[in-house]
């Protein structure tokens, strides 16, 4: 099974988030699953890959050439796919992955999460969509989703397509659904 992880590449975040990513990577590797990321070597993105490799897991990165050019690529990946655009990156990650876990992150992470969630709702795929949030950073997002549903902006059942988890074990279990 291939698990895509969306997460921050910011070098200025609290180290607890980087540790979380590393531990998730270890969990994926220990399960003998493959990790798919955006192909970068910094911050949480790099940590999740290092964790997977430390547990003898296989890692796959998908990165646009522009990011390779500024030395963000993780060349230790077992596979590193270099594409031209961010759109191609997301499409390839979606195509080659069997489930998606979103960790804390910024605008890019949220954009990836929303595309996967909406894609599941529209039946472009039927793959698990998981949020791993042990620190409560996505609590306001969860509340917003509930509010949007109560105001009929989100159809009933759409929120149920997201598995909201707080432990690595629960996140990995949700991927196996």
Model regions and ranges:
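A cross-family phosphate/adenosyl-ligand binding-site feature
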Residues: 1-96, 134-176
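Short, structured loop/turn "capping" segments at alpha-beta junctions
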Residues: 59, 124-127
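Active-site/ligand-binding-proximal alpha/beta "capping" segment
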Residues: 88-123, 130
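Short loop-to-beta-strand entry elements in the cores of soluble alpha/beta enzymes
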Residues: 127-135
């Amino acid at each position: 099974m291939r698990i895509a992880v969306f997460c921050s590449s910011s070098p200025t975040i609290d180290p607890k988030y980087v540790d979380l990513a590393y531990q998730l990577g270890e969990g994926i590797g220990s399960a003998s699953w493959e990790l798919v990321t955006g192909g970068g070597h910094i911050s949480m993105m790099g940590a999740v890959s290092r964790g997977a490799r430390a547990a003898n897991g296989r890692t796959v990165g998908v990165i646009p050439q522009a990011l390779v050019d500024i030395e963000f690529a993780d060349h230790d990946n077992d596979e590193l796919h270099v594409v031209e655009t961010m759109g191609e990156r997301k499409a390839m990650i979606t195509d080659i992955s069997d489930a998606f876990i979103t960790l804390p992150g910024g605008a890019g992470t949220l954009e990836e999460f929303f595309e996967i969630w909406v894609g599941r709702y529209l039946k472009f795929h039927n793959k698990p969509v998981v949020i791993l949030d042990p620190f409560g950073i996505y609590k306001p997002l969860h509340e917003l989703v509930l509010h949007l549903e109560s105001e009929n902006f989100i159809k009933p059942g759409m929120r149920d397509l997201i598995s909201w988890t707080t432990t690595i074990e629960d996140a990995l279990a949700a991927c196996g659904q």
